Amino acid sequence: MAQQADQQTVTDSTPELPTTIKELADLLDIPLVDCLVPCNFCGKFLDFLEVCDFDKKQLTLIWKGHFVTACCRSCCAATAIYEFNEFYQQTVLGRDIELATGKSIFDLKIRCQTCLSFLDTIEKLDSCGRGLPFHKVRDRWKGICRQCKHLYLNNDR
């Protein structure tokens, strides 16, 4: 009993680990530009643009004990491709996503199938208007963001 009480006290007093690189930098009281975080997959340290990109995409830091990793831009793309190839479920075109989900396009969280960033409202509406596909992968919806759209549309020529 006493051991359980001690264990619970330690657990209760353990601070919650940061989930973003910005939160990590704030916790360490260092500038974001000085925050060096390795990629979980390739081991390369993320450069400043990748750090900003990681947080913009609302990705979550991976903690293994007290060791933290993130995901670089190249590995994000590789992960997106892997997930699509291994866990693809279905495709709907344009506004049909609302019929498939029973939700408004405004209420859906959709990540880019290529870079994993969240699509904003304009990107989702653009995909609906153009009749572009939305893919269900691992029970989550994927579309195409404005950055990756140019690659996607140029490949159709």
UniProtKB/Swiss-Prot annotation:
Keywords: Activator, DNA-binding, Early protein, Host cytoplasm, Host nucleus, Host-virus interaction, Inhibition of host innate immune response by virus, Metal-binding, Modulation of host cell apoptosis by virus, Transcription, Transcription regulation, Viral immunoevasion, Zinc, Zinc-finger. One of its GO terms (cellular component) is host cell cytoplasm. A zinc finger (unnamed) spans 39-75, 112-148. Coiled coil: none annotated. GO terms for biological process: DNA-templated transcription; regulation of DNA-templated transcription; symbiont-mediated perturbation of host apoptosis; symbiont-mediated perturbation of host ubiquitin-like protein modification; symbiont-mediated suppression of host innate immune response; symbiont-mediated suppression of host type I interferon-mediated signaling pathway. It is found in: Host cytoplasm; Host nucleus. One of its GO terms (molecular function) is zinc ion binding. Its main location: host cell. SUPFAM superfamilies: E6 C-terminal domain-like (SSF161229). InterPro entries: E6 (IPR001334), E6_sf (IPR038575). It comes from the Viruses. Forms homodimers. Interacts with ubiquitin-protein ligase UBE3A/E6-AP; this interaction stimulates UBE3A ubiquitin activity. Interacts with host BAK1. Plays a major role in the induction and maintenance of cellular transformation. E6 associates with host UBE3A/E6-AP ubiquitin-protein ligase and modulates its activity. Protects host keratinocytes from apoptosis by mediating the degradation of host BAK1. May also inhibit host immune response. Belongs to the papillomaviridae E6 protein family. This is Protein E6. It comes from Human papillomavirus 12.
